[in-house]
Regions:
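The start of beta-strands in P-loop NTPase/AAA+ ATPase cores
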Residues: 1-3, 100-101
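Alpha-helical substrate-recognition element adjacent to the catalytic core
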Residues: 2-81
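C-terminal cap/substrate-recognition subdomain and adjoining C-terminal extension
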Residues: 60-140
Length: 140
């Protein structure tokens, strides 16, 4: 399973630049562990991510917080200026089947064309335990 992850509004409550909520990260960890899922960044944060050398301070903070929960970032989508195209291209490049991914995002407007397995998180709460329960019922 692959989780395509937006950050702002999913791992925080849109409370300012580059803020991360431990509760939201714990909920993501629970979801990833139950589904044996890898994380692929779709967030604009991904532009600061690199496998070689040091990433941006925000990504380093994210990697540290994820690591504390036993999670790592497997990859990131390319910058094609269209979230649907970026995710679709990653799915094609990595031969991911329709039943083997979830898209977590808080912004429906990023998805101008229909895409399967999209789950919209309330950006006032970030990812909650109830979201995790709903997703586990749907994808387990």
């Amino acid at each position: 399973m692959t989780i395509f992850l937006d950050i702002d509004g999913v791992l925080n409550q849109l409370q300012g630049n580059y803020h991360l909520e431990d509760t939201c990260i714990s909920n993501l960890s629970l979801l990833c562990n139950k589904l044996n899922a890898d994380i692929v960044l779709t967030s604009s944060w991904r532009l600061g991510y690199t496998n070689i050398g040091k990433s941006s301070p925000q990504i380093e903070k994210l990697k540290k917080k994820l690591s504390q929960q036993g999670l790592t970032i497997k990859g990131r989508t390319k910058n094609l200026n269209n979230r649907v195209k970026e995710i679709t291209q990653y799915i094609l490049d990595h031969n991911i089947s329709t039943n083997d991914y979830i898209i977590l995002d808080d912004d429906q407007t990023e998805f101008t064309t229909p895409i399967t397995n999209l789950y919209i998180v309330n950006n006032k709460t970030g990812l909650t335990k109830q979201d995790v329960k709903t997703l586990l019922k749907r994808y387990r």
